[in-house]
Amino acid sequence: MDFSKVAPPIFDGEDYDLWAVRMEAFLDALDLSETMEDDYDVSSLPKDPTTEQMKTHKERKTKRAKAKTCLFASVSQTVFIKIMTLKTPKEIWDYLKEEYKGDERIRSMQVMNLLREFELQRMKEDETIKTYADKLLGIANKVRLLGTQFSDSRIVEKLLV
């Protein structure tokens, strides 16, 4: 598959965790995920560099530029304005994570709200079992993305009740 024609997922400030999973997969597919690591360095070339050093330097510089472009292209204008002055993909990624993922207290509140939403779910008369199961699974996966265990048996139990 030609991944150059696949558009990145767009982040508008909502559902950071879902966007981050999709964006990581997108960057992996383009072989750019390593640019998000702390030790990804594009240092200056030494005096009288070898051909191999020049090639490696150019590849790393190009990867960093592509990753930065992907991140810029994957956010709404509102989010872009907040990150446009950041220099590296790592800085952009870390900023988005800190800004939108939320601290532990916020995440625990999100988990509590999702668990409440799960418990309050009832299958509607005109709803198929598949639609209802998909809705429950969606809530469960959001809880899991927030780092909380959620067993499949709990979903099955809810489906059977």
PLM-predicted stretches and their roles:
Residues 1-161:
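N-terminal Lys/Arg-enriched interaction segments
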